[in-house]
């Protein structure tokens, strides 16, 4: 391991800001950045020696790679975190436009929805992972939420309640229980978890998350986040009566005034159920 990679890993371990998922993503991005800086010729760089020239070199490299606006923003966010931890918080402009990076577009070009197939579930040997995947499919949960799901806390009469510490951005939320299928799933979760999270007693969260990732790959599920997309599209059809644009339904511009009002109401509901605070993000799902 190169010096910079090692120092950034230590920096991340000493400053565990955010959820487990956020920490893991940050470490992965910073490890990539350290490798890119090495390739750019900064081979003896230290974590405390971060300078504007390094940021400029990285941004130039990323533009050559034609990465998405969202990826730009995630990488710059990791760089700002790094700069802040080494006492250089003001070194990187807060406005991404300083680097010629525009606003993220939330307009999806094609559906990323993924339906959970029986044959895929049959390849999952870990019953905890199997139930986490079913929760993701049935309630549109993120991976971390579905692993940390604790039935004694979460299951209410007509909804499930997600604790802030389980969620991205620390936003607690509830998702309605609408079907008998969902209730049967929650009973299965109660029986296995016995009040605790969907993590076996002999493992911690990180170990179970890694096991989840391995099992999902083995089952051939390339994009488990697509289960959230499928949930969003099902809910949209339930709430409006027609399919979402990305699922083959009518484009928003073709809707009548009455339909547009219903469309906006549905997007607000779905955004809240998915844990987002802006309805514009639903364009990625719908």
List each language-model region with its residue ranges:
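Basic, Lys/Arg- and aromatic-enriched nucleic-acid-binding interface segment
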Residues: 114-143, 261-267
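Short, charged phosphate-coordinating catalytic segments
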Residues: 136-159, 283-284
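Short basic/aromatic active-site micro-motif
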Residues: 220-264, 276
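N-terminal core-binding DNA-recognition domain of tyrosine recombinases/integrases
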Residues: 9-104
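Short functional hotspots where side chains directly engage DNA or cofactors
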Residues: 159-165, 248-286
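Active-site/catalytic core of tyrosine-dependent DNA strand-transfer enzymes
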Residues: 178-241
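Conserved tyrosine-mediated DNA breakage-rejoining catalytic core shared by Y-recombinases
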Residues: 148-185
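DNA breakage-rejoining catalytic core of tyrosine-based enzymes
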Residues: 100-119, 168-181
């Amino acid at each position: 391991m190169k010096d910079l990679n090692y120092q950034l890993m230590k920096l991340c371990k000493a400053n565990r800001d955010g959820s487990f998922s956020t920490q893991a993503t940050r470490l992965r991005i910073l490890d990539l950045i350290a490798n890119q800086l090495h390739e750019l010729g900064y081979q003896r760089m230290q974590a405390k020696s971060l300078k504007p020239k390094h940021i400029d070199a990285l941004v130039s490299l990323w533009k050559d790679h034609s990465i998405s606006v969202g990826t730009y923003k995630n990488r710059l966010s990791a760089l700002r975190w790094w700069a802040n931890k080494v006492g250089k918080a003001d070194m990187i402009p807060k406005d991404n436009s300083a680097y010629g990076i525009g606003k993220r577009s939330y307009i999806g070009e094609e559906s990323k929805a993924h339906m959970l197939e029986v044959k895929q579930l049959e390849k999952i040997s870990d019953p905890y992972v199997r139930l986490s995947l079913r929760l993701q499919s049935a309630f549109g949960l993120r991976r971390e939420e579905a692993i940390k799901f604790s039935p004694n806390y979460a299951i209410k009469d007509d909804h499930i309640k997600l604790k802030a510490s389980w969620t991205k951005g620390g936003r607690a939320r509830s998702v309605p229980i609408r079907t008998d299928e969902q209730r049967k799933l929650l009973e299965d979760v109660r029986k296995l978890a016995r009040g605790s999270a969907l993590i076996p007693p002999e493992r911690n969260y990180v170990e179970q998350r890694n096991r989840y990732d391995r099992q999902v790959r083995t089952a051939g599920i390339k994009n488990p986040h697509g289960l959230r997309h499928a949930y969003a599209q099902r809910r949209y059809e339930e709430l409006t009566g027609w399919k979402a644009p990305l699922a083959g339904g009518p484009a928003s511009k073709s809707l009548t005034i009455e339909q547009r009002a219903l469309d906006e109401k549905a997007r607000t509901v779905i955004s809240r159920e998915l844990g987002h605070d802006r309805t514009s993000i639903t364009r990625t799902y719908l």
